[in-house]
Regions:
Chain A
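Hot-dog-fold acyl-thioester-processing enzymes
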Residues: 1-56, 111-134
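HotDog/MaoC-like acyl-thioester-processing domains
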Residues: 3-5, 68-69, 80-134
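Hydrophobic beta-strand-centered segment that forms part of the acyl-chain substrate-binding groove
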Residues: 36-87
């Protein structure tokens, strides 16, 4: 599963160096991930209805080239099948040239909303959707 | 009731003009308000326990002078007694000179969390605490 | 001059009440304003080339109904002709029903970037573009 | 070199799960880093005076336990001597119990502000301050 969304860099995301402040890419990644999850009917609301939340447990980001005000950028989110975690890889690209601005990865763990217990394997129906094809 | 808190302007709040982005003052105002509310045991959690939320219904901000990176600023929050709304006035000042950077006002309305109904008068115990002295 | 843009409410803009945190509407307003300004070739970069910045000097916001996660909203930005300030009015609407979520107004003043002096009248070419029809 | 700062978790940093949104820890890390840098007279302004900017090139974050509204947290920032990069490690701790909420690492590279060229070794005076002792 993968998904591309386009974002136009807003003014309020810039820092005094006239580039996107590095922490704001985390927002772009979340927008990409939520768009992919919506495509497979796994919005946060649906996850909650199944009784689980999926907090991010690790995040790695590599910054390649800065994004500028008004620039059209693509967030390409790719799901990585895994039985234990919800794993996504991200590429943030310039929309015109598709040159890489940023690459990243996040890992999310299922938490039972009632008991607050962590799940070391994805519970159903998440295992079927995200667990890969053995 | 009034309260002063000190904030050191963080880098991530700046915009490309090297000053605090105007929308970020809303965060400073909320920090001032929450500090004042905590002093009178009216944290958001306590409000929720009493069954009410207090969304902001109007906000006015006047920007006088920009705040810069690393600047020590004071948020002075003053409660304005009122029977219908939770009203606060704010002054954001340079800590060293107390010169004015920003003045603002917010109005919050009580909402019954269960019924989602708006309260056109402050419910108890908020009326006693915030309603003024007549 | 007016302009409508569509925004899908992102997760990271929500607060614990499951609605958009009130300060985040300021970002939506800026995106609407920048889209309108781009349409008349008055991006912030162009303003800077003419030697002026336009900090927001006053802002008023009225919150009518909360916006939710994933909701499609419209920011309708309308320029109000004025010789002294850059004035915009905003309506934030539900995209499906066009019911009002938020109305707002901002006023921006021209500042000479070199001298840091405020302009009590819009300088050219801004006066011609934004000053109205007399 | 190391530095501890205290932060009280503000309401606007929370997400609908009533915990700090994962992207906001990046702000806490920056506040810790800037406090440490100020202690050794290496604020961003001073870096700029020397002709260099230090964009973050990689960031890794591991989330251990969520931070809540009003919680007092400590950001412990430790400089890791290195000749090529400005490297910091972070621990975000509950202030009362010092239990770990989050650990992270960032790497920053020197960029010559005039030429926009990356420096594969720290330039002076940064090499002396941050390069370690051999």
């Amino acid at each position: 599963m993968e998904k591309e969304i386009e974002i136009i860099v807003p003014f309020y995301d810039l820092d005094p160096m006239h580039v996107v402040w590095h922490g704001n890419y985390v927002k772009y990644m979340e927008r990409g991930r939520c768009a992919l999850l919506a495509d497979c009917s796994m919005t946060y609301e649906n996850m909650e209805k199944h009784g689980y939340a999926f907090p991010v447990v690790t995040m790695r980001v590599k910054y390649v080239k800065p994004a500028m005000f008004g620039q059209k950028i693509i967030v390409r989110t790719v799901h990585v099948p895994d039985e234990n975690f919800l794993i996504f890889k991200y590429e943030i690209l310039d929309a015109a040239t598709r040159s890489k601005l940023c690459v990243a990865e996040t890992k999310q763990m299922a938490i039972d909303i009632k008991t607050h217990e962590s799940c070391f394997q994805l519970p159903e129906p998440f295992l079927t959707t995200f667990g890969g094809t053995k």
